[in-house]
Design a protein with these regions (language model features):
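Conserved ABC ATPase signature
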Residues: 17, 58-62
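Conserved ABC ATPase "signature" region
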Residues: 25, 29, 37-54
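Hydrophobic anchor residue at the start of the ABC signature
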Residues: 72
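Conserved catalytic motifs of ABC-family nucleotide-binding domains
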Residues: 79
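Catalytic Walker B motif of ABC-type/P-loop ATPase nucleotide-binding domains
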Residues: 83-87
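ABC transporter nucleotide-binding domain
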Residues: 101-189
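Short, charged/small-residue-rich alpha-helical element at the C-terminal edge
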Residues: 157-228
Length: 232
């Protein structure tokens, strides 16, 4: 356990009635971290996770975002090489989610910590993961880079186009997902028509004010993978 850290989004490892810092002291003793190493590590984590204002607050009085940041710090006091995160952003507001994700990215980049993340939040996957494993009915359905999953399961891309005025859009080689007023949502396969070619064709035919291209939401890709495997 010296090289492993664990955080559960719905269960804390901190002592409910103790101030945060006293829970940290107990964990320091459990993991056998020397006082000097603990002091340096704690100072670093307090700064990175902005814990200073509630270190002396009992855990039961913390907000969910504060508790999650405290749990992250607790799991890292012994500087583990492997960190397991189970639903680390569940229930968090937008600001807290961004802060937690930024910290996890920094942890991996600066310290080389391997992070294994389980989540139902697809935004967590897109923001944090370089390798994605999809599991269904106890079996591994996909294992590899996120971009490879996109290409294998769902090769299409989305193009969102804002027009200067209301115009009916009718195009070959593309599907019109939705058209609301001057905004048109198209989906196309780059294997059939390249992105530059499609953009050139659209801007020549329609009064385009703005447009952008993006990948379909990761939720759609995962759902399509489950549907494909169900058919098989």
């Amino acid at each position: 356990m010296q090289h492993i850290g664990v955080v559960f989004g719905q269960r804390t490892q901190l002592w409910w009635d103790l101030p945060v810092v006293e829970s940290f002291e107990l964990l320091r003793s459990i993991y056998g971290v020397s006082p000097g190493a603990y002091k340096a590590r704690l100072a670093q984590l307090v700064e990175q996770l902005d814990l200073g204002s509630f270190l002396d607050t009992p855990v039961r009085q913390l907000s969910l975002g504060q508790r999650m940041r405290s749990d992250l710090a607790a799991s890292l006091l012994h500087n583990p090489k492997l960190l397991f995160l189970d639903e680390p952003t569940i229930g968090l507001d937008a600001v807290s989610k961004l802060a937690v994700r930024a910290f996890i990215r920094e942890l991996n980049a600066q310290h080389g910590t391997t992070v294994i993340l389980t989540t139902h939040d697809m935004d967590d996957i897109e923001a944090l993961c370089t390798r994605v494993m999809v599991i269904g009915d106890g079996a591994i359905l996909s294992d590899g880079p996120l971009e490879a999953l996109r290409k294998t399961v769902h090769s299409e891309r989305d193009l969102i186009m804002d027009l200067e005025r209301d115009v009916e859009v009718d195009e070959r080689d593309v599907r019109i997902i939705k058209q609301e007023n001057q905004r048109v949502h198209l989906r196309f396969d780059p294997a059939l028509i390249s992105t530059p070619a499609l953009i050139g064709r659209l801007t020549a035919r329609y009064p385009v004010r703005d447009l952008f291209v993006e990948n379909p939401p990761i939720e759609e890709i995962i759902a399509q993978l489950y549907r494909q495997r169900a058919i098989e």
